[in-house]
């Protein structure tokens, strides 16, 4: 490999902050201003060395061509019924954004209802959330530009796809809930702020409000229905009960799976919605999560983790709501996690469980909770579902590492309740029968058994010679279940690779216990679990350190950066996407304050002691041994990322280049690429996705000397 001449970057040694008596220097704090000329010059100088490096990777062209070819397969969502019509999303293959179609019947001709591709030339305007009125005649839809979390809500009459004049701004992390009379909709907005709000600003998001918009009026006339002036971090999302009588308000403070639950009986508002609603505080603490499923009169069914870390179903009668009076409808499973529940055909409940990171789907009786049927599923994930209380049918979508998607339809009016394949998609050019997926359980440092999926070509020799791509996340109660990824399958097929996904602690794979095992004081467990996954792959002969790439995004970017700092000898290549790198300051920007439930906050002395031990920015050091250098590193971020603001990766790369990159023994590249008109990832246009994965895998191939296999 070659040694690099990195840009000269100014270090402000006077930028020192006192944390509980510890003086911490932050020499690149000036990079926190995204609009300064200095920051723009830094980004330009970094991109100037990174872009040519990526473009000169011998396989980039081959990879991009193959990705474009194989990703060109049809992508469907489940059909869903609204009013008298059916709707579904469909992407012909390489469209930048998926398109919403409408049909008068399942067999009827499909017409375009909403095509986000017409809203920008480069595909960077994306649909972010939508909600149909109860009768299906109107749809509200959110649009986001350049990947920002900020949303503009517009409205359309479905008949004739006619756009209305109503426009809602200042919207972010919002609910969209119509009242059943179709007159208007609840949504969330933030107060006006100084300066811009286009996703390139870093100002913090506080004081979210719940508003009600009456169709056909100006946003300035919208009605304030709930606010929490004493609790700036609270966010309250509304939904309507199935019968339309109750507004349920779910209040969250951070990312923990806990919420308060207030409700308003609209029958107690004789003049309609005219101001702050008469909220009844059913649950007024953050000691559990309460997810509304359905109700019969005043008896409400909730999915909860209160005293049940794997979740259960309970009934609460609003006329007799004491906790001692709650009834268990479906008890907690000792091992499997209840992920979601839906009520359908008025008397059935569909329950989706996670069993050892694989989904199972069941039908239960709503009155008794009894199991009626288990739907047959291969090993994989349920990634789509539709079917509401008044529907008599359900659709569900299955995917796995080797199957792009099968949509099933089940008519619940039929005696035998047999699902049929409604749509199945195949990808030309990758024959699933050539590959195999195995799930293993490896021991972590403390002996905990961690699940990991491994995908590879059948019949490979486990001689340590294969390039491997290890992915992890490990946070926020999010489970990483099997999914179909063309870009990773190309790595397996054309780069002779082994794909591994480690289901480390911090995620939700085994309920709230698994989540709590990888947060706050236990965060190091995530890093240990991931490093032990790498050691397992090496020990079993799948790969060797010099052939191993680790990858993660967001909280997973934090994961791989920390692992590079802690064990630079264990990996050949690290790709960190939109990572959280400055653990002492993350809470000060946009929505970062919500993550303190997983990470803690440096304002607290005890939390500071945890964070300073692993914060990627504060733990970069040149390895002592002469024969150990940092792995090749590529950090990816974007100018409109207002979730993990793009100051994290620039500060981290500047630190890496300064402390490590100037050493004679550091021949592996330490690079960053900052994309423009892009954000944290949601709604990213297909064209940008293809460029990004081509960069990633070209970087891996160049750094690890991997040849292309035709």
Curated annotation (Swiss-Prot):
The modification N6-acetyllysine is found at residue 157. It catalyses: Hydrolysis of Pro-|-Xaa >> Ala-|-Xaa in oligopeptides. InterPro entries: AB_hydrolase_fold, Pept_S9_AS, Pept_S9A_N, Peptidase_S9_cat, Peptidase_S9A, Prolyl_oligopep/macrocyclase. One of its GO terms (cellular component) is cytoplasm. It comes from the Eukaryota. GO terms for molecular function: oligopeptidase activity; serine-type endopeptidase activity. Its EC number is 3.4.21.26. GO terms for biological process: proteolysis. It holds the Pfam family Peptidase_S9_N. PROSITE patterns: PRO_ENDOPEP_SER. Its main location: cytoplasm. The active site is at residues 554, 641, 680. The modification N-acetylmethionine is found at residue 1. Keywords: Acetylation, Cytoplasm, Hydrolase, Protease, Serine protease. It is found in: Cytoplasm. Cleaves peptide bonds on the C-terminal side of prolyl residues within peptides that are up to approximately 30 amino acids long. Belongs to the peptidase S9A family. This is Prolyl endopeptidase. It comes from Bos taurus.
């Amino acid at each position: 490999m070659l040694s690099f001449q990195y840009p000269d970057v100014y270090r402000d040694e006077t930028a020192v902050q006192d944390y509980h008596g510890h003086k911490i220097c932050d020499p690149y704090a000036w990079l926190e201003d995204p609009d300064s000329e200095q920051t723009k010059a830094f980004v330009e100088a970094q991109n100037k060395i990174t872009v040519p490096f990526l473009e000169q990777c011998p396989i980039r062209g081959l990879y991009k061509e193959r990705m474009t070819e194989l990703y060109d397969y049809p992508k469907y969502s489940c059909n869903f019924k609204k009013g008298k019509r059916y709707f579904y999303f469909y992407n012909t293959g390489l469209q930048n954004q998926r398109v919403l179609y409408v049909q008068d019947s399942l067999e009827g001709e499909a017409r375009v209802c909403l095509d986000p591709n017409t809203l920008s030339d480069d595909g960077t305007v994306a649909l972010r959330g939508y909600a149909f009125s109860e009768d299906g005649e109107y749809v509200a839809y959110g649009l986001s530009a350049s990947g920002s979390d900020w949303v503009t809500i517009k409205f359309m009459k479905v008949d004739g796809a006619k756009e209305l004049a109503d426009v809602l701004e200042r919207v972010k992390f919002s609910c969209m809930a119509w009242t059943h009379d179709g007159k208007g909709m609840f949504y969330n907005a933030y107060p006006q702020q100084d300066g811009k709000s286009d996703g390139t600003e870093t100002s913090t998001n506080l004081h979210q409000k719940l508003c009600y918009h009456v169709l056909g009026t100006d946003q300035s006339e919208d009605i304030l229905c709930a606010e929490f002036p004493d609790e700036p971090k609270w966010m309250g999302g509304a939904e309507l009960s199935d019968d339309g009588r109750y507004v349920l308000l779910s209040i969250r403070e951070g990312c923990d799976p806990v919420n308060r639950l207030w409700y308003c009986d609209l029958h107690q508002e004789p003049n309609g919605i005219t101001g702050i609603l008469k909220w009844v505080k059913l649950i007024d603490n953050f000691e559990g999560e309460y997810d509304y499923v359905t109700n019969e009169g005043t008896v409400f069914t909730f999915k909860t983790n209160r005293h049940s870390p794997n979740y259960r179903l309970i009934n609460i009668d609003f006329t007799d709501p004491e906790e001692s009076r709650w009834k268990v409808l479906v008890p907690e499973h000792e091992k499997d996690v209840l992920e979601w529940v839906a009520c359908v055909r008025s008397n059935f409940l569909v329950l989706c469980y996670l069993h050892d990171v694989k989904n199972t789907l069941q039908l239960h009786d709503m009155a008794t909770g009894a199991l009626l049927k288990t739907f047959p599923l291969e090993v994989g994930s349920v990634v789509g579902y539709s079917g509401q209380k008044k529907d008599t049918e359900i659709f569900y979508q299955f995917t796995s590492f080797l199957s792009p998607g099968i949509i099933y339809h089940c008519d619940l009016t039929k005696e035998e309740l047999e699902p049929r394949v409604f749509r199945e998609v195949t990808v030309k050019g990758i024959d699933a029968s050539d590959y195999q997926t195995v799930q293993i359980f490896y021991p972590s440092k403390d002996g905990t058994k961690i699940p990991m999926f491994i995908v590879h070509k059948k019949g490979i020799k486990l001689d340590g010679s294969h390039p491997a791509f290890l992915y992890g996340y490990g946070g926020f109660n999010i489970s990483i279940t099997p999914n179909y990824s063309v870009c990773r399958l190309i790595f397996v097929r054309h780069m002779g690779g082994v794909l591994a996904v480690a289901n480390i602690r911090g995620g939700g794979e085994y309920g709230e216990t698994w989540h709590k095992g990888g947060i706050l004081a236990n965060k190091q467990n995530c890093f240990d679990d991931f490093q032990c996954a790498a050691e397992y792959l090496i020990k079993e002969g799948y790969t060797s350190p010099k052939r191993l790439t680790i990858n993660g995004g967001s909280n997973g970017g934090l994961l791989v950066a920390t692992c590079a700092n802690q064990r630079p000898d264990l990996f050949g290549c690290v790709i960190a996407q939109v990572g959280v790198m400055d653990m002492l300051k993350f809470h000060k920007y946009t929505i970062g304050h919500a993550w303190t439930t997983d990470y803690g906050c440096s304002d607290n002395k005890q939390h500071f002691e945890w964070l300073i031990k692993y914060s990627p920015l504060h733990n970069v050091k040149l390895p002592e041994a002469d024969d150990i250098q940092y792995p090749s590193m590529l950090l990816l971020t974007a100018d409109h990322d207002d979730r993990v603001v793009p100051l994290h990766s620039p500060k981290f790369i500047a630190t890496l280049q300064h402390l490590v990159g100037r050493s004679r023994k550091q021949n592996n590249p330490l690079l960053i690429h900052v994309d423009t008109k892009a954000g944290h990832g949601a709604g990213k246009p297909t064209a940008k996705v293809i460029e990004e994965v081509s960069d990633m895998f070209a970087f891996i191939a160049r750094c690890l000397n991997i040849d292309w296999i035709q």
